Structure formats: structure tokens, C-alpha cells
Swiss-Prot record:
Keywords: Cell inner membrane, Cell membrane, Chaperone, Membrane, Protein transport, Transmembrane, Transmembrane helix, Transport
Identification of the protein by name: Membrane protein insertase YidC
Keyword Transmembrane helix assigned: yes
Gene behind the chain: yidC
Subcellular location: Cell inner membrane
PANTHER family: CYTOCHROME C OXIDASE ASSEMBLY PROTEIN COX18, MITOCHONDRIAL, OXA1
NCBIfam families: PRK02654.1, yidC_oxa1_cterm
GO cellular component, one term: plasma membrane
Compositional bias per record (Basic and acidic residues), positions renumbered to this chain: 368-382
Function according to Swiss-Prot or TrEMBL: Required for the insertion and/or proper folding and/or complex formation of integral membrane proteins into the membrane. Involved in integration of membrane proteins that insert both dependently and independently of the Sec translocase complex, as well as at least some lipoproteins. Aids folding of multispanning membrane proteins. Probably also aids protein insertion, folding and/or assembly of membrane complexes destined for the thylakoid.
Major localisation: membrane
Subunit structure, interactors included: Interacts with the Sec translocase complex via SecD. Specifically interacts with transmembrane segments of nascent integral membrane proteins during membrane integration.
Pfam families according to UniProt: 60KD_IMP
Length: 382
């Protein structure tokens, strides 16, 4: 499904914007905004639900406990009352469905930006090399890799898969050829022959595991030597992997620290991701009473996630998408937080803010020293 959405929805939109602006960087920004706008109704539902549950949760938990205690011996009545409670405040799971519906599209968008034309495309084949006397008992199971859209030019691209008709289990001493082909079965090498620059997109093959157990030639032929596990990688260059955008040196560049040097464009993108994450988090808590139990987690989470992406091998094009998506999310949260709440939730929120103010006043160290003559004394014991 991810491949289908990428090939039939996202890449055509990408082609359209590249045709308009002749910049893959602008095309990424435009594609991200278009998809986020299209998903606005779904993501808005999740944000609204999360906002309402954040307000209603303390009251709901208290009333749920009361209902379960009061009707402990009457399960039917208990379920009826819990159902009424959900009807009043909504289900805590209501925001999950819109999120689940949009996830395939977001995963497809992520996969599109991790592949051609923005990055080199790897095809991995895991081989099981067996002793010759054991191979006769193995039933061949044809292998096909996930498909990837390969760009040969700005307008020419097609899905390509890697296949092994005889399967991934081979005998020591045998040789097999890993085939790259289109979905219609045409050899990838034949397709490249139709383009003047086709040779630039020829795959390179190497063993990433079990180099002492097998060898692989330039045409993808694997020769097994000894029993064991081996992994073969065929990599096709990305058309726009070396294209820059604004301060980004190459959209396909991966890694914050490579060969003893810092890639400052990656560092800026990761920092931008962290900053937009914090802004979105702050906006989501606007107008809400502070929650000391969640305060520490809210401070640490953005730092942990941002730090993780410093060392996670994501292409610069994907990081650009993540920054733009976070900016859109923050703007969306800002707009939705301006919406009026239902009357019952607004009353709960007002009470929570009022009670929070009373707690802060009661715990103030200057409360007794600044007490007016007509105010009652605090219960503080000397």
C-alpha cells in the first residue's frame, strides 16, 4: 500500500511542482504543505480530541471511579452509566481513528522522500547459504523485494524490484543472479539502454554481511563459497541526491558527523526540527492549567527526540520535510486552540485554572507576611 500511494499519488504531485519550480527543494516543501492541507480535517479531529481529553480527564477519572464503586454489584448499570459519561465528554480513543487513517499517507510521504530521486536507493537481499547435500530438500520460494520508483530524468521514472526466482536459499558452490526489473518484467538494464544518461543509474553491488562466505560481481551475480548467512546490497544512485536547496548542500546527504567533519546543514535542520517541536508543544498547552506531573516529560521529550535525529541516518530532504510538517502542525494547533470549547468543558477549565491559582497562592512563602488585617490566618503551624 505504501508503494502504491507513493507511485500513484505522491510522486505525480512531486512531478507537478518540480515542473513548476524546477527545484526539488521547493517541490518537497510544496508537497508537504499540500498533503498536510489535505489531511487537515483528520489531524484537526485528533488535536481537538486531545485538547478536550486533557481538560476532561481529571473529572472523567473521578466520576469513573465513583460509578465503578457505586455500581460494583450491578455490571449492567455500571456500563450504562459509563456510556453516559463517554457521551458527555467523548471517548479518549476518539482521536486515534483520524490518526490511524492518515498514517499510511504519512508513511508513504516519508518513504517517498527517503528514496529516488532524493537519495540512493538500496535493494537488500538476505541469502542463506547451505551445504550442497541439504539444498535438494529445500522448496524454492521466489523472492521479490519491495518496489522503489527510480528516476532516470526529471520526467522519467518507474517502479523497480529485485528478484531471485529460485529463492534466497542457495548451495555453497552455486551462483545466482539478482535481477533488477520493472513490474512488467522488463530488465532494468534494458530500460537504462533507452536513455542517453542511463549508465549513470547503473546499480553497484556489494556484500554488507558475509563477505568471507560469498562474492558478488558487477552485474549482481552472487557466488556462494561457504555455508552461512550473507546480505547483498544493490544501490541505484538518486537523481537529485546531490541537488542543493537554500543552505542544504545535498538533499540526499546523510549524517550529522561524517568522516571527521560536521555537516552544518544537517545540524541546522535537526535544530529546526527540535525548535518547531517545542513551539508546537507550547502552543498545545496554551490556556491550560500547568501539570507538574507532565512538566518534566514535556521538557525532556523534545531534547531526546532531537538528539536521536542527530545520529539517525536520514537524508536532508526528509529532515526538510519534518521541519516544514512541524511548522504546519504548530500553526494548525495555534488555530484550533482559538476555537471555543463546549460549555461543559469550558466550565471545567475555568474551575481548574481557578483552583490552580488558589494552590499557588496558598503555597506562596509571603502569604502570611503580606496578609491584610481583615484576612483570616492561614492554617500554617508554627
Amino acid at each position: 500500500m505504501i508503494g502504491f500511494l507513493s507511485d500513484n499519488l505522491l510522486i505525480p504531485i512531486l512531478d507537478f511542482f518540480y515542473g513548476l519550480f524546477h527545484s526539488y527543494g521547493i517541490a518537497i516543501v510544496a508537497l508537504t504543505i499540500v498533503i498536510r492541507i489535505a489531511l487537515f480535517p483528520l489531524s484537526a479531529g485528533s488535536i481537538r480530541s486531545a485538547r478536550r481529553m486533557k481538560i476532561a480527564q481529571p473529572v472523567m477519572q473521578k466520576r469513573q471511579a465513583e460509578i465503578k464503586s457505586r455500581y460494583a454489584n450491578d455490571p449492567k448499570k455500571q456500563q450504562d452509566e459509563l456510556g453516559k459519561l463517554m457521551g458527555e465528554f467523548g471517548s479518549p480513543l476518539a482521536g486515534c481513528l483520524p490518526l490511524l487513517v492518515q498514517m499510511p499517507i504519512l508513511f508513504a510521504l516519508f518513504a517517498t522522500l527517503r528514496g529516488s530521486p532524493f537519495a540512493d536507493v538500496p535493494y537488500l537481499v538476505n541469502l542463506k547459504i547451505l551445504p550442497p547435500e541439504q539444498i535438494a530438500a529445500v522448496e524454492p520460494k521466489p523472492f521479490k523485494s519491495p518496489r522503489h520508483s527510480i528516476f532516470i530524468s526529471d520526467k522519467d521514472h518507474f517502479p523497480v524490484i529485485a528478484s531471485l526466482p529460485g529463492g534466497t536459499k542457495i548451495a555453497a558452490g552455486d551462483s545466482v543472479n539478482i535481477k533488477l526489473e520493472t513490474l512488467s518484467g522488463e530488465k532494468y538494464s534494458n530500460v537504462l539502454g533507452k536513455f542517453e544518461n542511463g549508465s549513470k543509474f547503473s546499480p553497484t553491488w556489494k556484500l554488507t554481511k558475509g563477505a568471507d562466505l560469498a562474492s558478488v560481481s558487477a552485474d549482481g551475480t552472487v557466488t556462494a563459497k561457504y555455508p552461512g548467512d550473507a546480505t547483498v546490497e544493490g544501490k541505484i544512485p538518486g537523481l537529485a541526491a546531490k541537488s542543493g536547496f537554500l543552505f542544504i548542500k545535498a538533499l540526499g546527504q546523510v549524517g550529522f558527523y561524517v568522516d571527521g567533519a560536521i555537516n552544518w546543514d544537517i545540524a541546522i535542520l535537526v535544530a529546526g526540527f527540535g525548535l518547531t517541536l517545542v513551539i508546537s508543544q507550547v502552543l498545545s498547552g496554551q490556556g491550560m492549567p500547568p501539570n507538574p506531573q507532565q512538566a518534566t516529560a514535556q521538557k525532556i521529550t523534545p531534547i531526546m527526540i532531537t538528539g536521536m535525529f542527530l545520529f539517525f541516518p536520514l537524508p536532508a530532504g526528509v529532515l526538510l520535510y519534518m521541519v516544514i510538517a512541524n511548522m504546519f502542525q504548530a500553526f494548525q494547533t495555534f488555530l484550533l486552540n482559538k476555537e471555543a470549547l463546549p460549555e461543559n468543558l469550558q466550565k471545567i477549565l475555568d474551575d481548574q485554572i481557578k483552583n490552580q491559582g488558589k494552590k499557588e497562592l496558598a503555597t506562596s512563602p509571603a502569604i502570611d507576611s503580606e496578609r491584610l488585617p481583615f484576612e483570616p490566618k492561614s492554617n500554617k503551624q508554627n
